[in-house]
A protein has these predicted regions:
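Conserved class I S-adenosyl-L-methionine
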Residues: 133-143
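Conserved SAM-binding loop of SAM-dependent methyltransferases across substrates and taxa
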Residues: 144-156
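Conserved SAM-binding motif I beta-strand of class I
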Residues: 158-163
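S-adenosyl-L-methionine
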Residues: 164-201
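A short glycine-rich, Lys/Arg-flanked "PGG" loop and its adjoining helix->strand segment in the class I
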Residues: 221-235
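Conserved beta-strand signature within the Rossmann-like core of class I S-adenosyl-L-methionine
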Residues: 236-244
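Class I S-adenosyl-L-methionine
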Residues: 247-283
Length: 283
């Protein structure tokens, strides 16, 4: 069990940003974002490319990036895509121009990106917890940290967030939209969620549980896991469990099994269809 490393500040260019810069007709001063939309700086665009302080983005870089708008590139000589393979394929994705990013694992996105952006998606889930003033909050499966950030922003006194996959941890350190994750009020732990819960007492008022798909991490949808959750949540505490809607076109409803197993573990659980979540209270 260890803490995340610190964030790494590197200039990043999305294909959407490149398309925007290439669309500019006149040379001159322009607002440019090299942190995927978190902020902008004054740059100078011309036929050869764009210059922002001491960073130069050549025209061939812009053209390469613009061909794949959702990809993210590191602005350096080789201009690599922010993606790598380590047993699985990991890729940072820009779902829109200057919008919060998501991460893709083997082609599957870890956030909703249609209708709602990933950051707003996390905020909507956290709103299901209702009152957070002074709460001790647990966030299971950190991902890029948007849920932990939203928990703190909505009034949690302290947030503990747990992530098992070191590649996702690495991606969070590189993602500009994850910077607010790295604060002393958020305790960042790299560990298996089951092992972590076994070491906890009854110490959390609220829990956000946003696991990978059932196919990938079935143990995080089990009765045994929900019993561990029940043990660490204080009486009257709330768990919000994102389940999505896998198999819905085939008539399969994952949430029904989740509700049944959470009730079996002792929770009063209901499905919240508009957020694809199950909300459970320890009674």
């Amino acid at each position: 069990m260890r803490d995340f490393s610190e964030p790494v500040a590197v200039p990043l260019l999305s294909g959407y940003e490149a398309k925007y810069l290439l669309s500019l007709v006149r040379c001159g001063e322009v607002d440019v974002s090299l942190d995927l939309g978190v902020s902008t700086s004054k740059g100078f665009v011309c036929n050869e490319g764009v210059s922002i302080d001491d960073v130069r983005v050549s025209r061939w870089m812009l053209e390469k990036a613009a061909a794949r708008p959702e990809d993210v590139y590191v602005v350096e000589e080789r201009f690599p895509k922010l993606a790598w393979f380590e047993e699985k394929m990991y890729r940072l994705v820009a779902p829109g121009w200057r919008q919060p990013t998501t991460v893709e694992i083997n082609g599957v996105r870890m956030h909703r990106t249609v209708v709602v952006n990933p950051m707003d998606d996390a905020r909507q889930k956290v709103m299901l917890l209702r009152e957070l003033g002074g709460a001790e909050a647990l966030d299971i499966c950190t991902g890029l940290g948007y849920t932990a950030i939203a928990l703190l922003a909505n009034g949690a006194r302290r947030v503990v967030t747990v992530e098992k996959d070191p590649n996702i941890v690495k991606m969070a350190t590189l993602n500009p939209w994850s910077r607010q994750l790295f604060t002393e009020k958020i305790e960042r732990i790299v560990a298996d969620a089951v092992d972590f819960l076994r070491k906890c007492g009854e110490e959390f008022d609220v829990v956000m549980h946003d696991p990978p798909s059932f196919r990938v991490a079935g143990e995080l949808y089990s009765t045994e896991f929900y019993r561990l959750l029940y043990r660490v949540v204080r009486r009257g505490g709330v768990v919000v469990h994102y389940v999505g809607q896998p198999g819905v076109k085939r008539g399969f409803a994952l949430y029904r099994g989740v509700v049944e197993r959470m009730r079996k573990a002792g929770f009063k659980a209901v499905h919240i269809p508009e957020c694809f979540c199950v909300r459970a209270v320890k009674v």
